[in-house]
Swiss-Prot record:
It is found in: Cytoplasm. This is Peptide chain release factor 1. It comes from Desulfovibrio desulfuricans (strain ATCC 27774 / DSM 6949 / MB). The modification N5-methylglutamine is found at Q232. SMART domains: PCRF. GO terms for molecular function: translation release factor activity, codon specific. One of its GO terms (cellular component) is cytoplasm. Methylated by PrmC. Methylation increases the termination efficiency of RF1. Residues 281-301 are annotated as: Disordered. It comes from the Bacteria. The keyword Cytoplasm applies. Peptide chain release factor 1 directs the termination of translation in response to the peptide chain termination codons UAG and UAA. The gene is prfA. Keywords: Cytoplasm, Methylation, Protein biosynthesis. Belongs to the prokaryotic/mitochondrial release factor family.
Length: 356
């Protein structure tokens, strides 16, 4: 580990030297690359230097334990205790920092929410989840764009697909994939009985052209007339688009825009992201036979979280975490859940690394 850290520090010093050159601003693209690489290394190098300083101080204070002066020995003993307590924590932080980063963490995210079991109540819950993620996005200064929506009769969603763009969106939302269960008394329930319903959430990194190769001959594109509620035609032009990726039989439809070209562009964006997510899923399955037991497996059949409204309780079943702050969570305050899931994923990765 320390040989790797020394290599990173050497690279950091080389970047500092490159950034100090007088002609560094001549090539703006290269300058941006250098500053980003320098910033990416700064935290781990700073922590490594702190670890080195504490190690050196600890060695010096251990020598002072044999000093003739009892006061110096007492002070040294106190410093040794402090150093011995701090060093393992620093080593753990360094191990976490050296874990391979997910290259997709930086990407924007396509979020798909679908009503599951529970009829209209499930559709209303799907709308509540969309609102929750929208509020979370507002708190993070992210931008939300609805790509496609299929409303239900009472203001819910049978399905809604959106693009969330901003800083490291996928790294925060990737553990939200799975089945979300709700327990509450529906507005339509006259007897006051608690009903259980569910919605599924799919989280996919936004695919770019370099991520996925889609050949035109692998696509079947159908154009048809968009229809609204009750079968009413939204407009008289054929602007709705259905794209089928023949090799994977992946189908995406989009009819929200009046422009056929805009609908096609949106459908292609969703299609590419689904194909990328499916390929990543296949690779992950091959790499880890027990991945379903891991945090963030993304298996949609897996019940990952329960929202119990009568008790004001939210339980994430993957990490056995229960929070009694459901009202705040539904208003988008998801950071406690996101951080806990991220910490659990890091612990799992460290365990896997240790067993290799």
């Amino acid at each position: 580990m320390f040989a790797k850290l020394e290599g990173l520090e050497k690279k950091y010093l080389e970047l500092e030297e490159a950034l100090a050159q007088p002609d560094v601003f001549n090539d703006q693209d290269q300058y941006r690359k250098l500053t980003k690489a320098h910033a990416d290394l700064s935290d781990v190098v700073e922590l490594f230097r702190r670890h080195r300083a504490v190690s050196e101080e600890l060695a010096e204070n251990r020598l002072l334990l044999h000093d003739e002066d009892p006061e110096i020995r007492a002070m040294a003993q106190e410093e040794v205790h402090r150093g011995e307590a701090e060093l393992p924590n620093l080593e753990h932080e360094l191990k976490v920092m050296l874990l391979p980063s997910d290259p997709l963490d930086e990407k924007n995210t396509i979020l798909e929410i679908r009503a599951g079991t529970g009829g209209e109540e499930a559709a209303l819950f799907a709308a509540d989840l969309f609102r929750m993620y929208t509020r979370y996005a507002e708190l993070k200064n992210w931008k939300v764009e609805i790509m496609s929506e299929s409303p239900s009769e009472n203001g819910g969603y049978k399905e809604i697909i959106c693009l969330i763009a901003g800083d490291r969106v996928y790294s925060h939302l990737k553990f939200e994939a799975g089945t979300h269960r709700v327990q509450r008394v529906p507005a339509t329930e006259a007897q006051g009985r608690i009903h259980t319903s569910a919605a599924t959430v799919a989280v996919m990194p936004e695919a770019e052209e370099v991520d996925v190769e889609i050949r035109p001959e692998d696509l079947r594109i159908d154009i048809y007339r968009a229809s609204g509620a009750g079968g009413q035609h939204v407009n008289k032009t054929e602007s709705a688009v259905r794209i089928t990726h023949l090799p994977t039989n992946t189908v995406v439809t989009c009819q929200d825009e009046r422009s056929q070209h805009k609908n096609k562009a949106r459908a292609m964006k969703v299609l590419a992201s689904r194909i990328l997510a499916a390929e990543r899923e296949r690779q992950s399955s091959e790499l880890s036979a027990d991945r379903k037991a891991q945090v963030g497996s993304g298996d949609r059949s897996e019940r990952i979280r329960t929202y119990n409204f009568p008790q004001g309780r939210c339980t994430d079943h993957r990490i056995n975490l229960t929070l009694y702050s459901l009202d705040r969570i539904m208003e988008g305050e998801l950071e406690s859940l996101v951080e806990a899931l991220g910490t659990a994923a890091q612990a799992e990765a460290l365990k896997a690394q240790a067993s290799e």
